[in-house]
C-alpha cells in the first residue's frame, strides 16, 4: 500500500488502493456505508456534511456508473460538484493532469475523484496535491478501483452476512486486465474470505503473484461447485492484445455464466458483475436479470459506499 494513503495518525487521507488498507479502516468504511444505505439517506433528502466543499470528478476515461454514482454521493452530502470532461478541457491543448489538478485546487476544490487510463496516475496526482486535498481513485489502468471493491464487499455482506470465513468466492474471466479483480482480491483477503477461486483462460490470468493463495483453474464447471458467490468480469478488450481470446463465442462456451452452470454453484449463490455487462459473452440475460443477480444491488450500494468515503475524507 502506498504510504501517502494514511496520515501520521493512521487516518485515511486519500483512497488510492485497498492493498494493505488496515482491516479496521476497511470495516469502518463498510459499516458506515451500510448505515447510510439502511437509513435510506442515499435515496431521500440531502445532508449538509460537505456544504461549502467543492468536489471535482476528474475523469480521463469514459464512465457511466462510477461517475454518476460519485456525483450523486457528493451532491447528497451537500457538496458543490464539478464534472471535468477531458474531451472539452485544456488537456486537449497539452495541459497535464497535474496542472489541471493544481489549477482546480487553486480555485478551492478540495476533493478529487480521478479516473485515468495509466497505472499509478492517481497516486502521482495525490503526491502533487496540497495539504487538505483528498484524492479518490475511481480506477487507474489495471491497478485499482477501490470503491468498486468496497461496494462489492458491501453487496456480499448484504447477501451472505458479515462473516466471510466460510465464504467460497469465484472470480471469473479477464483477471489479468481487471483493476476490479485486484481490488476485490485485496479486500477478500483482508476480510478473511474462506476460499478464493480464480477461473479463466491462461492468457487472461496474471503472472505477477497476484493470485498467490487462490485456487486457480480453467475448468469453470468444476470451479463452480459449492460456490457462495460468483464475480463475473468483463472482457477488457480495450486493454487487450490481439489473439488473447480466440472468439467471443468460444469464450462464452467455456466461461459464460448460464442458468445451467449457475445450478452447479451453492444454493442461492450470489452473482456479481461490475459492469458494463457484455450480455451473451460473460453472462446470459437470464442470469443477469435473474433472482440470484446482485448487479443492480451493487449499483445501489455504490452510492452509499461513495458517500461513506467522501464523508470520511472530507467531512
UniProtKB/Swiss-Prot annotation:
It catalyses: carbamoyl phosphate + L-aspartate = N-carbamoyl-L-aspartate + phosphate + H(+). PROSITE patterns: CARBAMOYLTRANSFERASE. L-aspartate binds at residues 93, 179, 234. It is an enzyme of class 2 (transferase). Its EC number is 2.1.3.2. Coiled coil: none annotated. GO terms for molecular function: amino acid binding; aspartate carbamoyltransferase activity. Keywords: Pyrimidine biosynthesis, Transferase. Catalyzes the condensation of carbamoyl phosphate and aspartate to form carbamoyl aspartate and inorganic phosphate, the committed step in the de novo pyrimidine nucleotide biosynthesis pathway. This is Aspartate carbamoyltransferase catalytic subunit. It comes from Xanthomonas axonopodis pv. citri (strain 306). The lineage of its organism: Bacteria, Pseudomonadati, Pseudomonadota, Gammaproteobacteria, Lysobacterales.
Amino acid at each position: 500500500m502506498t504510504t501517502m494513503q494514511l496520515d501520521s495518525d493512521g487516518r485515511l487521507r486519500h483512497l488510492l488502493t485497498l492493498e494493505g488498507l488496515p482491516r479496521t479502516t476497511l470495516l469502518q468504511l463498510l459499516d458506515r456505508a451500510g448505515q447510510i444505505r439502511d437509513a435510506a439517506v442515499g435515496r431521500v433528502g440531502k445532508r449538509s456534511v460537505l456544504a461549502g466543499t467543492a468536489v471535482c470528478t476528474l475523469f480521463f476515461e469514459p464512465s457511466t456508473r462510477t461517475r454518476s454514482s460519485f456525483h450523486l454521493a457528493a451532491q447528497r452530502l451537500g457538496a458543490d460538484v464539478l464534472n471535468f470532461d477531458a474531451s472539452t478541457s485544456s488537456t486537449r491543448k497539452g495541459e497535464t493532469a497535474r496542472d489541471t489538478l493544481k489549477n482546480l485546487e487553486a480555485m478551492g476544490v478540495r476533493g478529487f475523484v480521478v479516473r485515468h487510463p495509466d497505472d499509478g496516475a492517481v497516486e502521482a496526482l495525490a503526491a502533487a496535491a496540497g495539504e487538505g486535498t483528498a484524492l479518490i481513485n475511481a480506477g487507474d489502468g489495471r491497478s485499482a478501483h477501490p470503491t468498486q471493491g468496497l461496494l462489492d464487499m458491501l453487496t456480499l455482506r448484504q447477501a451472505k452476512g458479515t462473516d466471510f470465513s466460510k465464504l467460497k468466492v469465484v472470480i471469473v474471466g479477464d483477471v489479468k486486465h481487471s483493476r476490479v479483480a485486484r481490488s476485490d482480491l485485496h479486500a477478500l483477503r483482508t476480510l478473511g474470505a474462506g476460499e478464493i477461486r480464480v477461473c479463466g483462460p491462461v492468457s487472461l490470468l496474471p503472472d505477477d503473484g497476484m493470485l498467490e493463495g487462490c485456487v486457480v483453474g480453467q475448468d469453470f464447471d468444476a470451479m463452480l461447485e459449492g460456490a457462495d458467490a460468483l464475480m463475473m468480469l468483463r472482457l477488457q478488450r480495450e486493454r487487450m492484445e490481439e489473439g488473447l481470446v480466440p472468439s467471443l463465442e468460444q469464450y462464452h462456451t467455456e466461461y459464460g455464466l448460464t442458468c445451467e452452470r449457475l445450478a452447479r454453484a451453492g444454493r442461492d449463490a450470489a452473482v456479481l458483475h461490475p459492469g458494463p455487462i457484455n450480455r451473451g459473452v460473460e453472462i446470459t440475460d437470464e442470469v443477469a436479470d435473474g433472482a440470484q443477480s446482485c448487479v443492480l444491488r451493487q449499483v445501489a450500494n455504490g452510492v452509499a459506499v461513495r458517500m461513506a468515503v467522501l464523508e470520511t475524507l472530507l467531512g
